[in-house]
Amino acid sequence: MSNSLNSSKYQPLTTRQGDRIAVVSGIRTPFAKQSTAFSTTPAVDLGKLTVKALMDKTDIDPKLIDQVVFGQVVQMPEAPNIAREIVLGTGMNIGTDAYSVTRACATSFQTTANVVESIMAGTIDIGIAGGADSSSVLPIGVSKKLASTLLALSKTKTVYQKLSLLRTLSLKDIAPVPPAVAEYSTGISMGQTAEQMAKSHGITREEQDALAHRSHTLAAKAWKDGLIQDEVMTAFPEPYTVWLDHDNNIRHDSELASYAKLRPAFDRKYGSVTAANSTPLTDGGAALLLMSEKRAKELGYEPLGYIRSFAFSAIDVHHDMLMGPSYATPMALDKAGISLSDLTLIDMHEAFAAQTLSNVKMFASNKFARECLGRDKAIGEIDMDKFNVLGGSIAYGHPFAATGARMIIQTLRELKRRGGGLGLNTACAAGGLGAAMVLEVE
């Protein structure tokens, strides 16, 4: 155990019998840009596709799965409990427990943590965690005026009464209402927050574009070198006329100069955040199979790796709302009993290049550590040779609830290729939330 952190905060994630919690396997759909390959596939179907592929890949007896915890950020009213629909749609035992959670962009870190805690408590032996989201199949709402009028119409008895109510509606009242993109509590969007963070922390347009170019270049190389294919299923969504076996957002011919051509997306005059240095709206799903180390051995599985620790944070939503990794990571490192320098790999969710680079700066800031974290010194400067080595969300895309599981799968597989070690996954999330998880591979 490292002496550089407070060892009194070390919290081993084990069962009562001392078994670690193993990630036996993981899989995901290809991630598709909004309105492309999965344009008519709702999140619940993406979730079913993913979990069924995971069950087929591991050849697990469906009766052995005790629990499914799944997430969806953009909720569909007709299927509010995506986890239960997945159980019912994939051939699992009808008695399999299932519930859904949401933690914005950190959702599948939360579903993983929930399954880990259930295994530690002894309430389940085997669980599936993950998430799916569609930015193409969205719940399009109606105005409050139209909603109240439709309700009143259902209670009228005469044609005159109905017409009288309908006359009160304007064209604005009957226009569709798309899902909100701004924070409910502040009215500030994620993109606006990224702009604020770029200005507050001195992140230049050139630095943001360089990170985006790096992300695409590394992701393209990872696919070209055959490092990603085995964790991505071939998806045949209904009506089964097309299929997809790769992420379709990655720029395989990325050129740094091309990024400078785009106009800022959120602050047209003075901004630096563009569509190219931000993660795109994306469709996809990802899932993990978890169980105790002992149970994995009994069933003949060789685990991908183990969950060493996790931590979640919550901060103010008015300023630096996407700084969650800088708050959650020190807690996760403490709970794992390690320091930043002990890590073999660091994978940070790239919601925006500005947000990512702001967090990278704060990891190394003693001032931030003292004033915001109450710590004597910073956790340390990130070794960029360890950072997002296969590219990040700017390249792969970001189906909100699936990103955490993608990162876990990708990091564990890369650690195994490197002969083992410790990896950090961390993400910001809407609402000022953050997540960090330490992974271990022998």
UniProtKB/Swiss-Prot annotation:
Q: Which reaction does it catalyse?
A: an acyl-CoA + acetyl-CoA = a 3-oxoacyl-CoA + CoA
Q: Which GO terms describe its biological process?
A: fatty acid beta-oxidation
Domain of life (superkingdom)? Bacteria
- Any Pfam family matching the protein: Thiolase_N
Annotated CDD domains: thiolase
EC number(s) per entry: 2.3.1.16
HAMAP family under this entry?
FadI (MF_01618)
Please describe what this protein does. Answer: Catalyzes the final step of fatty acid oxidation in which acetyl-CoA is released and the CoA ester of a fatty acid two carbons shorter is formed.
- The protein's name is 3-ketoacyl-CoA thiolase
Gene coding for it: fadI
